[in-house]
């Protein structure tokens, strides 16, 4: 599983990893927001697509987990690559398999974005795994029942964020 940041920004490295995995019969999963399409000599076994919806927009004046203060330029860069439909469509078509893992913040607007994207990209409900929004254990515990209910009502799957439940706000674990 390759995750964190945007692994598909590193096309040469990803392609090299597909060679390594193919020679050994290893399945590669890449978790990506979909901002960059990468061709590889061997298709990636599973794309875990977690697009950035409007609820992911950084807030000016806050500090990122990496310690940077968010400014207008940071927000503009985020928005520039937030939803690259062309790259996402190519990624889902080119590689072997995928699932869609949107983060839901509990709002009607958030649900509308999740469903609009799913329909636009023609993603089946059984490939949709909704994750609760939140970056603390306490927030996730509040969100889990809401996400379970949403998934039951709409025919989606639910996936947790176990690393946050286990480690709360600790980084690099």
Predicted regions and their residues:
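Short, charge-patterned binding micro-sites
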Residues: 5
């Amino acid at each position: 599983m390759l995750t964190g940041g945007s692994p598909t920004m590193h096309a040469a490295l990803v392609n090299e990893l597909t060679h390594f995995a193919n020679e050994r019969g290893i399945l590669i999963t890449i978790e990506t927001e979909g901002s960059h399409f990468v061709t590889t000599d061997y298709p990636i076994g599973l794309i875990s697509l977690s697009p950035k919806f409007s609820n992911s927009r950084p807030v000016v004046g806050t500090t990122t987990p990496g310690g940077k203060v968010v400014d207008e330029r940071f927000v503009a860069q985020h928005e520039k690559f937030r939803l690259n439909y062309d790259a996402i469509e190519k990624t889902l078509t080119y590689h072997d398999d995928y699932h869609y893992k949107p983060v839901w913040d509990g709002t009607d607007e958030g649900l509308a974005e999740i469903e609009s994207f799913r329909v636009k990209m023609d993603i089946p409900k059984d490939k949709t795994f909704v994750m609760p929004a939140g970056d603390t254990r306490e927030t996730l515990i509040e969100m889990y029942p809401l996400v379970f209910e949403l998934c039951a009502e709409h025919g989606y799957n639910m996936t947790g964020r176990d690393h946050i439940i286990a480690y709360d706000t600790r980084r690099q674990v």
